[in-house]
């Protein structure tokens, strides 16, 4: 349903953000917000379109894959105090979103 972060068997991640990817990112975000789940789009622009990269001369369309990915990523809640019941609620809401599609 959504693309999850890949974790290799030798890795032990310490997630700073839990970012998923989906083509209907904005619809999913709206649905989660309506259900009381805070999300974020932490990286709305690919690097080549940031103001800090302007002097490099890149323009929209130069990196189409990066631009496509920037439109798909959504950060879900992740923090040490997140309770198992809250995690289950988030998962249930995401599943319900796709059941409604």
Where are these regions (language model features)?
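PLP-dependent aminotransferase class I/II
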Residues: 1-101
């Amino acid at each position: 349903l959504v693309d999850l972060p890949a974790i290799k068997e030798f890795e032990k991640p310490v997630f700073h953000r839990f970012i998923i990817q989906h083509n209907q990112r904005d619809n999913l975000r709206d649905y989660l917000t309506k259900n009381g789940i805070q999300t974020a789009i932490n990286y709305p622009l690919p690097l080549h379109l940031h103001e800090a990269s302007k002097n490099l001369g890149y323009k929209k369309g130069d990196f189409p894959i990066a631009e496509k990915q920037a439109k798909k990523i959504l950060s879900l809640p992740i923090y040490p105090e997140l309770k198992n019941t809250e995690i289950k609620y988030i998962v249930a809401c995401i599943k319900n979103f796709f059941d409604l599609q």
